[in-house]
Amino acid sequence: MNYGKLKNRPFSIIIVTGDFMKTIFKNCTLLDGTKDMAARENIDVAIENGKIVEIGSITPSVSDEVIDLSGKYLMPGLINLHVHLPAGGKPQNKPMKTTLLTKIALSSAISRELVLKMCHAYAMQGLMAGVTTVRAVGGLDNLDTRLRDKINSGKLDGPRILAANFAIGVPNGHMVGSVTRPAQTVADAVKMVDELKGQNVDLIKLMITGGVMDAKVKGEPGKLMMKADMIKACCDRAHGYGLKVAAHVQSPEGVRCAVENGVDSIEHGSTLTQREIDAFKKHNAVLVCTISPALPMAKFERETLGISEAVQYNSNIVYYNMILGSKTALENGITVGLGTDTGCPYTTHYNMWRELHYFEKNVGVSPAFALYTATLNNAKILGIDDITGSIEVGKCADILVSNSNPLDDFRALSQPYMVVCRGKIYKEPKIEKYEKCEYELDKYYD
């Protein structure tokens, strides 16, 4: 994870209208977010008080704000199930000193406020790219819930945030020293769940296996680090609080141990045998596919990333096993969601659209299913599909408008024409992108 510097704001916005005025989007081409969605032309959508209030052929009153979309494509805002708000995905060719940076970031009230502002800037970067809801699954102390609360109270603009705050891990485990706190014992881990409940988190995040960079030898990515008794104790305590548990898992053994001991959401994943398939179904667990951070590590020139041959070898294992796991899950009726693991090198808050493309291309789903997965399906995973995720009367006005049809080419989403979040309209948002990041990633868009 990297803490990139920002040049002023990484976005610019024009606010067209506020939350309470009735606004009618005339003449749009509607993609409603449902599984079998197809483009519907010449549709009007009305929003008022942050909600969608009418869909169809609408006659405006004299007091209504009317925006003629002239056939542009209107769809639900994207939902990213896996982000890390303290980092922006800046290209790098050497490891960051994340432990030292984290100590500095949390060392004083002033530094914490600066990091909070940075997290907000990254959240806004995602919003300007059409991501209206994020699930933050590993941050610095309680900064993610603080940012969530400021946005929810109206003090700041921003996407809807469901926050886990810091992740729970084990000594020498994945991301310890930055977004993960190590638990020495089962009792320590349970106390951390209690602490997180006190911070009013929306879910708990566990780091159960190592990651690619943690592997010490070739062929050993995703080594199981957290023992079953700790996993079960954390899940039992979290479930007692009504909180779901997401877990970083990058090996078959890790998937099995996590799901069988109560984890609700497997982040990244790996290949699945019948035992894991049965466990997913028994426990109603879901898999969150995150191809975005794996592709650069597996496919880029090693010199571009500054990684060893062993790291790239392990990255390829993770990359292909994650794709195979997602395919197997879908074939067996297991729910698969989408996230980006934003914060990893070359994985930015503004590139959720690329994850949809990777999902279509590598997992073999249709473009409509990919868009459904990133909208209504992701909302179902979060338990907020009654609030957002599709264009339906009564739901929040979380909307993305593109100039062309994303079902023909997901690059249509790379620069939205308009974004609406809980009724607030942002027209022609501009995003400051990392040129090197876009240059390298575009090589693998086909």
Region spans (language model):
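Active-site mouth loops of central-metabolism enzymes
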Residues: 104-117, 174-191
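Active-site core of metal-dependent hydrolases
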Residues: 210-323, 337, 342-344, 364-365, ...
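Metal-associated gating/positioning segment near the N- to mid-region
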Residues: 73-150, 229
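His/Asp/Glu-enriched, well-ordered alpha-helical/loop segment
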Residues: 240, 307-310, 319-405
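Active-site metal-binding motif and surrounding structural segment of the metallo-beta-lactamase
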Residues: 58-75
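Active-site microenvironment of metallo-dependent hydrolases
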Residues: 16-43, 48, 58, 105-106, ...
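Short, Lys/Arg-enriched N-terminal segments with co-localized hydrophobic residues
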Residues: 5-20
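Divalent metal-dependent hydrolysis catalytic cores, especially in the metallo-beta-lactamase
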Residues: 108-112, 119-144, 158-169, 201-215, ...
